Amino acid sequence: VIGVVGVNVESVIFANNILWPDVPTNRELKKSDEEKYAIFLSDLHVGSSKFLPEDFDKFLKWINGDLGNEQQRSISKNVDYIFIAGDLVDGCGIYPEQDKELLTKDVYQQYRDCAKLLEQIPEHIPLIICPGNHDALRISEPQPQLSKDYAKPLHDMNNVVMVSNPSMVNINST
């Protein structure tokens, strides 16, 4: 995603400036001496009939160390970050006849239900949450972080960090 500042004359855009996302251009790979993990989730779609509650329940049991073999439980103990890259909820009115697929037709309730699920993740693990096209905000990028007006229960959680889309996040830094 880039931003272009310029003038549109007939069918030609004259660019005066290009705005690049906040992403570094160097490609230096940094590694930790410790075995640590980051989990990337997206498209939970809480509130939709397409949400997978049984699978998410298994994830919650695993991240809490209650599911999996010895190696899998060892990995769950070393999770330091969970990123959720958009579409926490299914939203309302996102596409025609969406209401036929919704189990929860109130977007505020969808966010409350989502928070109840995410509260089951150990509080020492930061949850970095980025919005998506089904979340309650504008679809076009860049998107601001999720609003307290809609997602207050998530904002109230001590381990939640709301970020914009796109955004740059520095983890495990000294």
Predicted regions and their residues:
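Extended recognition/assembly regions associated with phosphoester-bond processing machinery
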Residues: 1-174
